Each structure stands twice: as C-alpha cells, then as structure tokens.
Amino acid sequence: MAKLLLGKEVTAAMNEKLQARVAALKEKGVSPKLAIVRCGENPSDLSYEKGATARAELIGVEVEKFVLPEDVTKEALIAQIEAINADDSIHGCLMFRPLPKHLKADQDEICNHLAARKDVDCMTDLSNAGVFTGKKLGFAPCTPQACMEILDYYGIDCKGKNAVVIGRSLVVGKPAAMMLMAKNATDTVCHTKTVDVAGIARKADILVSAAGVLNSLTKDYVSEGQIVIDVSINWDPEKVNAKGGKGAIAGDAVFSEVEPIVGAITPVPGGVGSVTTSVLIGHVVEAAERTL
C-alpha cells in the first residue's frame, strides 16, 4: 500500500509559517495585499476566488477584488492592470484566465502588462523566464511549485533521481521539469508525440503526471517504489462522490490500479490542488517582503 502524500498536511505547515511571516511584515508597517481581477461571473472563477479569499484571510493577507463586465474592452482591462501596478498597497495580482472569448487573441499581450514583481500567478513572460533562468524575475506557476512543496515536506530527495513529467504545458509540465532539474533530478518530459510513454514512465523514480486525461495513468505506467505526483483535475462521471452519487473529480491515475504498486502517491482530490492556493498566497507574502 502506497503512502498518501496528503496536501492538507503540507498546507497546514505552510500556513503556519506564512502567518508568522505576515505578522513580521505587519510589525514593519507592511500589510500584504492580493488583487483579484475577474471578468464576468464564471462559476469556476467564483469558486476559486472564494477559496483564495478564505485562504488569504486565514493567513492574514488582505484581498481587494476588481470585478469587470464580461464584455470589458481590451483597453479597459489593461488600464485596470496598470492601475494595480501603480498601487503600492497591492503586492500581488491574480487575474482569472482564460479571458472572455473576445479577448482570447490578445490574452498574452494583456497579461504582459502586469508588473512581474506583482505576478504571483506566473502569467507574464518575465515570470516564466525566471523559472528557466533560476532568477527571481517574478514568481513560478503555483501548481508545479505546489508539487515541489509536497516533495520538500515529505523529505523526498530529488538529487540524482530520474524524474519523468508527462505533459509539456507552460503552466505545469515545462516548469515542473525545470524545478525538478533545479533539485538536481535528471528529467525526461513526455508528450503526445512521445514513443512508449509507459516504458519511459516505468523507469522513473519520481513521476509527475500532468496529462489532464482521465484514467490515462494505468498500472502499465508505474513500478514498485515510485513517487507519483498526480497533478491533473479531471471530471469522472462514474466516480462515487461524497454524497454517494456518481460524478466527482479525479486525477490522471487509475488510483485502484496504481496505488497498490507505487511507493507514494498524491490523491485527487486532496493532493496537489489543496496546496496550490497556499502557494499563491505565499507568493503575495514574498512579494511584500521584496518591497522592504
């Protein structure tokens, strides 16, 4: 039976440390603040906003919300971002993406108007560059950093280990590979054009699955003693939920097949996702510390 790498334990430890850092900042007259920019009333955005606000309040970080209409113009949204850049009381900004459909073609341009020093969710090119250069140009993406927090909390040493990342997105796969390399792991990144992903995955000491495909990580992809970080959040219409009905979130892994084989695994839900929000708030705290 695999050890469960539970996000709630990681989050509890992170929150305690962050609360102490916030207290130290406030003693110096600095009150960390997160700006949340939302266009419209997307239910998933509202859900994440609620969770992020609650986590921020728990840690002691202020939240200021900027709610714009779904049909907001490109110019109006950029003006809002520039106003946040100019507001010294705001230390970090979370803007929900994807942006409304009429702004899709301009999303990268709009995102890059945010100052990297306030880019706590890694939506600018400069923040992404920081991940690849190892320089503190902005902040790393929250989800892959949450993976690293889990590895650190559970004392999993990456030095000299073979690490395989399934997925090459700029949001998770690529930065996760760079972060693992920074921990002195030897990386392999698999994607949709990779030949024999299962064979490559079986040779990993640390396997990060960020494919975003339900039930894609079967017993054929894993081997004894592996550390499996299941990043993805998928909808499984057949999975029994907390109310006893059908329909619940699940990761890439066929948990019933993979869990008996590997050494440790993050469950979904209850794994990486639960840590990500504390990483976001931690970035706000760090952004505030950088102003001292």
For each predicted feature, which ranges?
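Positively charged, low-complexity intrinsically disordered leader regions
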Residues: 1-30
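Short beta-strand segments enriched in small/hydrophobic residues
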Residues: 31-40
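Glycine-rich phosphate/diphosphate-binding loop of Rossmann-like nucleotide-binding domains
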Residues: 39-54, 135-231, 239, 246-247, ...
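Short beta-strand elements in bilobed, periplasmic/extracellular small-molecule ligand-binding domains
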Residues: 56-70, 187-189
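Short, well-structured alpha-helical segments in soluble
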Residues: 76-88
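Short, high-confidence coil segments that cap the C-terminus of an alpha-helix
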Residues: 89-90, 204
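Anion-binding alpha/beta catalytic cores of soluble intermediary-metabolism enzymes, centered on
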Residues: 92-158, 215
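Rossmann-fold NAD(P)-binding glycine/threonine-rich loop
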Residues: 108-120, 124-129, 232-291
